[in-house]
Amino acid sequence: MRMTILIRTCIAMLAIGAGLGANGAHAKNAVDCAKLNAATSGPEDNFRPPASGTVIGAGRAYFYSAPDVQCMTKRTFIIPGDSVTVYKSHGRWYNIMYMNGKTGEDFEGWIEQGRVHLDGQYGAQ
């Protein structure tokens, strides 16, 4: 009986240790999306004036809370044909704002550059 308890305890400890090892390795690769967004969202390198853009490609184009694939906002997306305001680029990302024409609600975030066609800058002639 004691041997069975000892074996089960050892197995449980090994399982916990393996889980911690996997999570620890993943945690080292995790991105702090809030910190990355704060570091990349300042106005100092914005397009002046902002650019207008149109969503291209197929299917939903998801918003990201920061310019990194780990920062996807799963419930916020736009679709091809939607118009956006583009504030800046960072690597392969655009910082954009989308205004819902039906509700007037606006959404700001990052989107992959390949999903937006720049139409030109506001006020440019």
Q: Which residue stretches match the model-derived regions?
A:
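Bacterial N-terminal signal peptides that target proteins for export
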Residues: 1-11
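Short aromatic-glycine-enriched beta-strand elements
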Residues: 91-95
